[in-house]
Amino acid sequence: MNSLVTQYAAPLFERYPQLHDYLPTLERPFFNISLWEHFDDVVTRVTNGRFVPSEFQFIAGELPLSTLPPVLYAITAYYVIIFGGRFLLSKSKPFKLNGLFQLHNLVLTSLSLTLLLLMVEQLVPIIVQHGLYFAICNIGAWTQPLVTLYYMNYIVKFIEFIDTFFLVLKHKKLTFLHTYHHGATALLCYTQLMGTTSISWVPISLNLGVHVVMYWYYFLAARGIRVWWKEWVTRFQIIQFVLDIGFIYFAVYQKAVHLYFPILPHCGDCVGSTTATFAGCAIISSYLVLFISFYINVYKRKGTKTSRVVKRAHGGVAAKVNEYVNVDLKNVPTPSPSPKPQHRRKR
């Protein structure tokens, strides 16, 4: 295969020698362009030197939302605003806000894609040179660029609270799954930053990848553009969730066995505080419980409105689990039973 590539690529490189400058390398996997250096330069210029990514250090107490009290205040304020707002606006007409909603989703698509590409650039050499176990369990994978990206992703979690504000203003239903997820994810990111867990890149990069697709879909939908891959938005969320569980349970096992049951087989310790390890495991596990609960409600409790609507939807749970975060079942007509097939009489 390599010889075939060389055979067909050689004439191209002879004709356009400048293409050699864009061959990917381990340190620069995106066309030999250092995304981090360009990002550092652009952000430094835009902020007039107030924020220099390459010089960033996460120091608790010196940065916004870097200690527990303001984090809890922000999350509490989020719940007060959305539930108080829903009560205060209950008798008003729904706001349309389609233009702002499009802008919101376009901004979050761009932010998620930027952070994802920057993170992949940092992770490729770590994983290739040192292996996957090193990347998720060794302190050497807790690098300055990645910590900078982790903190920026953490701040974005609070920006994503605006998702729910739109639901309130548009008089959409607020479900426990949606509201809990936003608050819990912000808290999860805080605990992992404080606990220096090297595995942080796994759930963060997967989540960023899903959010690129999800927010882009919401942007297109707000513009009235239908896409064939709608149901894959939630399938990607489910895949992300399963991978998160696998990686995090592996890391928690390594940590727990190393500390408390060293005679059991394990690879070694996983870096990160015990508090961060078990807090992360608890929050991720709660997502598992919520999804299983939804699944049981749809497929095991026959006859409920949720079950009938979801089962009749194209794609079933995979297409509707995320949509049911926002949909108001009271306003969804109960599907009528499918009519019995009529047979033509033979003459």
UniProtKB/Swiss-Prot annotation:
Q: Out of the domains of life, which is the source?
A: Eukaryota
InterPro entries noted in UniProt? ELO_CS (IPR030457), ELO_fam (IPR002076)
Enumerate the Cytoplasmic topological stretches. 84-96, 143-146, 222-231, 297-347
Modified residue Phosphoserine is at which positions?
336, 338
In the bilayer, the protein is annotated as: Multi-pass membrane protein
Q: Where is this motif: HxxHH motif?
A: 178-182
Annotated GO MF terms: fatty acid elongase activity
Q: What class of enzyme is it?
A: transferase
Q: Which reaction does it catalyse?
A: a very-long-chain acyl-CoA + malonyl-CoA + H(+) = a very-long-chain 3-oxoacyl-CoA + CO2 + CoA; octadecanoyl-CoA + malonyl-CoA + H(+) = 3-oxoeicosanoyl-CoA + CO2 + CoA; hexadecanoyl-CoA + malonyl-CoA + H(+) = 3-oxooctadecanoyl-CoA + CO2 + CoA; eicosanoyl-CoA + malonyl-CoA + H(+) = 3-oxodocosanoyl-CoA + CO2 + CoA
**Chain positions carrying an annotated carbohydrate:** 32
Q: Where is this motif: Di-lysine-like motif?
A: 344-347
Site positions per UniProt: Determines the chain length of the elongated VLCFA:
255
Spell out which residues lie on the membrane's Lumenal side. Answer: 1-62, 120-122, 170-200, 255-275
Quote the subcellular location field of this record: Endoplasmic reticulum membrane
> Can the keyword Transit peptide be found in this entry's annotation?
no
Biological process annotations from GO: fatty acid elongation; fatty acid elongation, monounsaturated fatty acid; fatty acid elongation, polyunsaturated fatty acid; fatty acid elongation, saturated fatty acid; late endosome to vacuole transport via multivesicular body sorting pathway; sphingolipid biosynthetic process; very long-chain fatty acid biosynthetic process; vesicle-mediated transport
**Entry keyword set:** Endoplasmic reticulum, Fatty acid biosynthesis, Fatty acid metabolism, Glycoprotein, Lipid biosynthesis, Lipid metabolism, Membrane, Phosphoprotein, Transferase, Transmembrane, Transmembrane helix
Q: Which family does it belong to?
A: Belongs to the ELO family.
Q: What else is known?
A: Present with 3510 molecules/cell in log phase SD medium.
Please give the function described in this protein's UniProt entry: Component of a microsomal membrane-bound long-chain fatty acid elongation system, which produces the 20-26-carbon very long-chain fatty acids (VLCFA) from long-chain fatty acid precursors and is involved ceramide and inositol sphingolipid biosynthesis. Component of elongase II, which elongates 16-18 carbon fatty acyl-CoAs such as palmitoyl-CoA and stearoyl-CoA to 20-22-carbon fatty acids by incorporation of malonyl-CoA. Involved in the synthesis of 1,3-beta-glucan.
Name used for this protein in its record: Fatty acid elongase 2
Q: Which organism is the protein's source?
A: Saccharomyces cerevisiae (strain ATCC 204508 / S288c) (Baker's yeast)
